[in-house]
Structures are given as C-alpha cells and as structure tokens.
Amino acid sequence: NLPNSQKTLSAFCDKSIPFCQMVLHGSIQYTGDPINLYHDEGVQLLNMIEYGYTPYYKLTASGSMQLKYTENNEIFSSKYSLWKKSIANAYKISQMLSSVQGETMSSHESDGIHSVVVYGNGAKLYVNYSSSEWTVDEKNVSAGGFLFVDSNGTKTEKWGSEK
C-alpha cells in the first residue's frame, strides 16, 4: 500500500503532490491505509477516491479486543460484520470510478481542502473535504463529497450520509 500523500508534509513543504499515485495510476492497482483503521472513515474514503486507491480494510471474524495482547494490537476496529455495509459502499464507489482505473492521472490540483484530478481520457474528479458546498467549473460539489464527470460528460455524485 502507498502512503497517503497528505501525511508526508514536513516543515519544509507547504503542498503535497501525490507523485507515486500519479505515476502508478493506470498501470497497477494499489491501496492506501486501511479504511477501518483511520480516525475518520469519510476522509479516508475521499482519500481513496482522490488518489485512486483500491478499497482496503484489515478485518477479523471476531472483535478486535481479542487482539489486545498480540502483535496486532494496533487493529482497533476490525470485526467484519460491523464493516460489511461500509465495505460494500466503498466497492460501489470504486466501481463508479472504473472508467478511469486504466487511465493515467494527467493532473492533480489541490489546496488541501478541494482537489481536482484530470485523467488521460478527459474525465474529471472533484473532491471536497470541506463542510460547505463547493462551486467549481460551474459545478456544485457537496460538502464532504465528490463529483465525477466521465469522458462523456456524465456526472456521478456521492456525498454526506450516503458515503
């Protein structure tokens, strides 16, 4: 799995560029951090969408308390039955973006709150991490959501409680 480029900022950098993701997207499938082990599932789903990750979860059949005294004690939320609905939703979102899975990322622009990704086939992805609606290119992107415009101009949107 590739690191989330948002985490790689240092005191010497004021902007993050998802270099690895831009180079690899369209060539191989890759994952990011496990969605179920991130402090905010909605943000991690938006990261997955923005950076082109394949959904990734670390799961167990029983609760994570059974891992407390093992080498896997960092796994704090892993019971499959609790994540089943979220997993189905993440794969549904991934399927929505399947038309760009084999495409390169031509450009990636981000101010840390809003991101625009353009793919080799001309499709565009708008990601809004803000708690307010975002208007860009005469399009509205819901708070905490994304808008995908495929190469034919067809829009697909997911947001808020539907994530």
Where are these regions (language model features)?
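Active-site-proximal substrate-binding groove within the catalytic cores of carbohydrate-active enzymes
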Residues: 1-163
